[in-house]
Design a protein with these regions (language model features):
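Beta-strand/loop-rich accessory regions of lumenal/periplasmic or secreted enzymes
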Residues: 1-138
Length: 138
């Protein structure tokens, strides 16, 4: 749910595995970002991990792919999503804000002005807290 795609999503507590957050688009690309979140908890199979809480709503995603493997620049040499190998890690991205996707009438169109991020200095404060043997949801 990116800035220009989130109007139809409810604010709620959601639970997904990292694998469930990835959508295999034909052309590999970043995806799975959640916007306007208040906190994010990332746990491994042993229920250990991190909780992220920020002073203002933020965006985050977690994938078993590196950014570089999903977007190799203009050449797009990686071809199709099934050709991209999973990384032996969880790539957690924490963002103050992300630009909208655009693509309203074609894939080349940039986001409307209200969904763009003006060039400026930004501050983003968040707290990382270790989580050990988490049981249930808060």
């Amino acid at each position: 749910n990116y800035a220009d795609r989130k109007a139809c999503t409810d604010i709620n507590i959601y639970r997904q595995s990292v694998d469930e957050q990835f959508y295999s688009y034909i052309r590999p690309q970043e995806n799975g970002t959640k916007s306007d979140i208040r906190w994010w908890k990332q746990l491994n199979h042993s229920r250990n991990g991190l909780q992220i809480v920020a002073e203002a709503p933020f965006s985050a995603s977690a994938l078993h792919y590196t950014i570089e493997s999903l977007d190799e620049g203009i050449a797009k040499a990686q071809g199709h999503s099934p050709e991209v190998e999973k990384a032996n890690l969880t790539n957690l991205c924490i963002d103050k804000v992300q630009m909208g996707l655009g693509c309203e009438d074609s894939w080349g169109r940039i986001a409307r002005p209200e969904y763009q991020i003006p060039y400026a200095d930004y501050e983003f404060t968040f707290i990382l807290t270790p989580v050990k043997h988490q049981v249930g949801i808060e």
